[in-house]
Each structure stands twice: as C-alpha cells, then as structure tokens.
C-alpha cells in the first residue's frame, strides 16, 4: 500500500466519521470524530473475537503499520495545524497576558512534569509496575503540554471572550514546544533513544544549551522567516500567489528548523502570529485576507478530522490492554492533579500584579486538553513492556481529556460566567 492509498483511506474515513457525528451525534468535531473512531475500533475487536478467522484485527494492525504516527504528526500535520491556529490569535491580547502565558508555558510545564513523574513512579511502584523515576518524568514531559489543536477548536465553538481565549490559546500554542524540548532532554538522560536520537546521557550544561538553542533559536528563526514572508506578501496583491507563499513559509520553516536543530513548533507559531497580525493588517487586501482565512480554516478542519480519526484508531497500538489498563486508569487523576498544580502556582503568582478572572484556575485546569502531540511522543519511544504501559497511560489521558473534559468544559465556563454570548 503506497502513501496515496493510505491518505485516501484516512480522508475517506474521516469524512464518513465526520458525517456520522454531524448527522447523528452532533458533538464538537474533535470529540465526535474521536468517539466514532474509538467505537469503530472496539467493534473491530469485538467482531474479531466473536467470529474466529475474520482477520479484521490483523488487517487493521497491518493498515496502521503503514502509518508512522510520530512522523505523520510531528513531521507533517503539526506545522500546518499550529500555523493555522496562530494565524487567528490576537497578538495584542497575547502580549497583554504575556507574563501569565509565559509562566504557564514554562514554570507550569516543569511543575506538571515533576508532579506527574513522581506520583506516577510512586503509584506504579505500589502496584508492582517496574518503571524508573526518570522514565516516569519523561512520561510527565510528554503528557504535560495541552493540545493547541483541540483547545483552539473548542474556543471557536464556545466563542470564549478575548482575554480568556488569549490565555488558553497562548499557553497551548507555546507549551507544546516547551514540552517537546523537556521530553527530548529527559529521554536523553534516560537513554530511551527514539525522538531524542542519543548515544550517551548528556550533562546538565549540555541540556541547558540544548534547551536554550531549541527555544531561543525557534523564536529567532520564526521571526526572521515570518518577516521575510510578510515582506513578500506586502510587495504584491495576487491572492493565489500569496496563498502559495504562506504554504511555502510553513513547510520550509518547519523543515529548516530541524536542519538547524531549533524548535519547529515554536518557530511556526511565531511566524503564524507575525503573519496573522502584522501581515493581516499591513500586507493583505480584503480579498486576500478572505481567501487566506478560508484556505487555512479548511486546512485546519481537514487535518483535525484526520488527526482525531488516527487517535481513535491508535487503540490498536497497545498490544495487551488487560495487562496495562489498571495503571493507565490510575494515571488519569494524577494528570488532573498535576494540571491543577501547574495552573494554580503561576496564577497565584500573577495575582500579585493585579486581579484575574474569577474561576481562572478551574477553567484553565479543565480546558487543558491533551491530544495528538502526547501520543506521537510516546510512540517515538522504542517498544518495550515499559513503553506499552506509558502508551496505554497516554491514550487513557488523551481519551479522557477529549471526551470527558472536552464535552463538559462548556458547563465549567458557564458556571463561571463565560462561554457563548459572554464578553
């Protein structure tokens, strides 16, 4: 099966599942697509058990074996989804909430990594699961970032007020880049290989240099190429060519970031903010803005559907759920507690500077959905019994956050006086 065949099947399945959700379930698109895909996966497993020799499970395993989820998301879908999200974020609102967003995306991520890692290690030890503290901290790094893809789709549907939208979208856009950097550093220390591509455990100084190069380099590269793209857009008024320029900017910038060893997600977010704000105001005609918004909204919707379809099918990546279900379920409340701590501390520190919205901590805690980035990172680790426990735990947290938190966050927002129709 070639790449086109795989893509054709995925897009067709995403369209069918999206139709089923829109026609019958009427859930938010991300939650609905994931639910339909998950139920379909469970039906395949059930048929395979009830009808011996059906080979449906092996056929599904074979199809998923054609897809490298880590490569598909981290080196494919992610750059387009991040740029599409950043393109519609108000930079002025982001700057106004800058200190809070910075605290959530840095201190918050580090706190979450620590709480998840330590509590997971203790819990696994109590139930006889042999996983080291460093590996549990690595798990904390891959599960801590909130998913900007899921969160921003949610914000559009809920019509959240601008200040809250800037806080949630800003954190989720940046903490995935920080989380990936922390994950790679901890994976190197744990000598897990995979995404980190290591041969020996690095020193603290090497890790510091690595983190600074990834983050600062990503910001600088994103600003530099974002400015080049802005100047190119400003010099002409031809919307097909301008669409091509934005597409080329995203793809070349993301590829270049890997060649020069800086954070691709951070670089793409910075470029998206630049083009979506300064570029939108000063370099685009009304007609161009309309076409670019429509184009990137379509990209966002289509790739989101494919991503959450893949998430629903990745249940087959766990070889034996019976062996790992208990630890996976225990990790869910641990991650919720870690999210609460990682939000409460930066918010408490920011209250010294002035009053913040009532209920901000529970709102940010419950809206911190996890998604494809976490699954891609855990799948990048080498296969082992320990990796299967981490994979099942990651999947449990992602499914809980998208289906339970994603479908109930509207109630949380309404409880604190925000949501559709609020200002």
Model-predicted regions and their roles:
Residues 1-423:
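Transmembrane helical cores of multi-pass secondary ion antiporters/exchangers
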């Amino acid at each position: 099966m070639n790449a086109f065949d795989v893509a054709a099947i995925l897009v067709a399945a995403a369209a069918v599942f999206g139709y089923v959700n829109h026609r019958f379930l009427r859930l938010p698109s991300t939650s609905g697509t994931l639910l339909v895909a998950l139920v379909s996966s469970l039906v395949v497993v059930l048929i395979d058990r009830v009808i011996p020799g059906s080979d449906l499970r092996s056929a599904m395993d074979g199809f998923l074996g054609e897809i490298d989820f880590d490569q598909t998301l981290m080196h494919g879908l992610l750059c387009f989804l991040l740029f599409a999200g950043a393109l519609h974020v108000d930079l002025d609102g982001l700057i106004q909430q800058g200190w809070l967003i910075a605290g959530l995306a840095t201190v918050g991520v580090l706190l979450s990594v620590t709480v998840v890692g330590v509590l997971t290690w203790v819990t696994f030890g109590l139930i006889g699961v042999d996983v080291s503290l460093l590996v549990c901290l690595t798990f904390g790094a891959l599960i801590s970032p909130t998913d900007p893809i899921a969160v921003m789709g949610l914000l559009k549907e809920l019509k959240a007020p601008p200040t809250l939208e800037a806080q949630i979208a800003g954190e989720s856009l940046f903490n995935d880049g920080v989380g990936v950097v922390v994950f790679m550093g901890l994976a190197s220390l744990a000598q897990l290989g995979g995404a980190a591509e290591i041969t020996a455990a690095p020193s603290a100084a090497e890790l510091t240099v690595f983190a600074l190069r990834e983050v600062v380099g990503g910001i600088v590269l994103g600003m530099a190429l974002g400015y080049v793209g802005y100047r190119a857009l400003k010099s002409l008024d031809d919307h097909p060519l301008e669409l091509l320029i934005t597409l080329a900017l995203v793809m070349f910038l993301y590829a270049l970031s890997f060649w020069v060893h800086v954070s691709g997600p951070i670089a793409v977010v910075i470029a998206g903010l630049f083009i979506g704000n300064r570029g939108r105001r000063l370099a685009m005609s009304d007609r161009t803005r309309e076409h670019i918004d429509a184009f990137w909204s379509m990209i966002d919707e289509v790739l989101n559907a494919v991503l959450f379809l893949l998430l629903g099918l990745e249940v087959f990546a766990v070889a034996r759920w019976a062996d790992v279900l208990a630890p996976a379920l225990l990790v869910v409340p641990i991650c919720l507690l870690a999210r609460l701590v990682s939000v409460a501390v930066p918010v408490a520190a920011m209250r010294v500077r002035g009053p913040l919205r009532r209920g901000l901590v529970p709102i940010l805690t419950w809206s911190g959905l996890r998604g494809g980035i976490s699954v891609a990172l855990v799948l990048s680790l080498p296969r082992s019994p320990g990796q299967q426990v981490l994979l099942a735990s990651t999947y449990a947290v992602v499914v809980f956050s998208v289906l339970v938190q994603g479908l109930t966050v509207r109630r949380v927002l309404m409880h604190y006086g925000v949501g559709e129709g609020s200002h």
